[in-house]
Amino acid sequence: MQTSILWEGSLPSKEEMEKMKQEGYLFRAVEGGWKICLKLHNTPTGTWYADNFSKSFLKEVEVHQYLEEVEKRATWFEVPSKELRVYEAGQILEKPESKEERICMEVLRDTKNHSRLLLKTNQTEAYQLGSSAIPTLESRARISGAALSSVEPAVLAEILNQCLKVAKGKALLRVSEGKVRAVHSAEKNGYQVYPLPEVFMLASVYIRGEYKKSTFLEGYADQTMVSAIWQIEDHRLEEVYGEIMEKYGKQVKEKLTATIRITSSDVAASGANIFYS
């Protein structure tokens, strides 16, 4: 399925057009001229592709099921940063024919309501760019600043493209639920992948085995992070707290509980963090 792109800057020369065709760009004649187009990648997704997606979980198993389902469709791959290009999505120029193309169009409607951007890699097809990927993409282009969030998408795309042309190293792309969700550094000291299903399964196993009693309270997920909260009871907790209170001349008469919150992210919005309270 093809979509036009909004082209900023000078129009490509004939020689540049031939090179772009080899890279996957398409030039379609329309009334009054022609449009530069890209074929969209039919990225696998479930029902959680919306950039403003969020979900709460009442059961611990639901968190694990969600993470496994998302990870099953997700992919990671590396691209030289200087080969990345960003464009504002234009019009769909073909009617979707397959189920995958119809889903791709639904995802594109959401993209146009949020980032409005496409990401061209060294592949011939373009990916839709999730809003969560913009901060890491700006990092690959080595630019930052509050003003970037205020400019029009086509202008932001051109700024990014000019900077990406001189970018160094490789980028590690996280593709999930219909879109690119992050553009990490793939360098030696860059982003380290810790699959979220493993992080939260290890947390569940540890908490269940380490404490006398644990109760899952709630979980939460959106396109930037996942969190889960447990309440715990343990005699060691009571002993330590009791000793502290005795130093201040007080006694602990009630049953003590504490909460553990685990948060993590695969788009660099958070590390793998543990909070006690």
Where are these regions (language model features)?
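Feature for intrinsically disordered/low-complexity regulatory segments and propeptides
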Residues: Q2-L202, E210
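Intrinsic disorder/low-complexity polar-acidic segments
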Residues: M1, Y191-S277
